[in-house]
């Protein structure tokens, strides 16, 4: 099973530490006017023009990506879904946070999908063996789907609001 990749915007000190002898020590994403360029570990870097992002562990991204209280992005990031265009999350941007909690939670959407109000996001099996569906009450694009807890299962869905 493949999962999307997430890259966090690197500070100047992180950029300096990301190279050794002109080669990348981490997987990097360079965003410039010419487009996106992914550099794997050991690739020759050359001259970097644009913003540099460092790949992070996707499953742990909810810890540093968003503020659950305010619903805003804490650190700029780029998510590369399995298919479709990249998703840019900018620091300070407001996002929708939707939580699914139950004995067994099965996500029904993938990162990059566009959802509208009423769309099923997850199937939830309760402790009483009932099947319930979590539906979206907003329209937007799925930017992140991640599991937070194992028992009971807890998933977080991050949606970027759709601009009308």
Language model feature labels by segment:
Residues 1-164:
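Well-ordered secondary-structure scaffolds
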């Amino acid at each position: 099973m493949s999962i999307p990749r997430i890259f966090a915007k690197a500070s100047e000190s992180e950029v300096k530490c990301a190279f050794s002898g002109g080669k990348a020590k981490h997987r990097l994403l360079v965003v410039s006017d010419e487009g996106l360029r992914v550099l794997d570990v050991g690739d020759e870097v050359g001259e970097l023009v644009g913003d540099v992002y460092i790949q992070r562990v996707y499953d742990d991204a909810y810890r540093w990506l968003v503020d659950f209280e305010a619903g805003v992005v804490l650190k700029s990031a780029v998510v590369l879904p399995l298919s479709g265009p990249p998703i840019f999350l900018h620091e300070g941007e407001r996002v929708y946070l939707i939580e699914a909690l139950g004995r067994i939670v099965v996500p029904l959407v993938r990162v990059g999908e566009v959802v509208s109000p009423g769309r099923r996001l997850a199937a939830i099996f309760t402790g009483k063996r009932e099947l319930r569906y979590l539906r979206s009450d907003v329209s937007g694009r799925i930017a992140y789907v991640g599991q937070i807890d194992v028992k009971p299962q807890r998933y977080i869905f991050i949606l970027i609001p759709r601009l009308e």
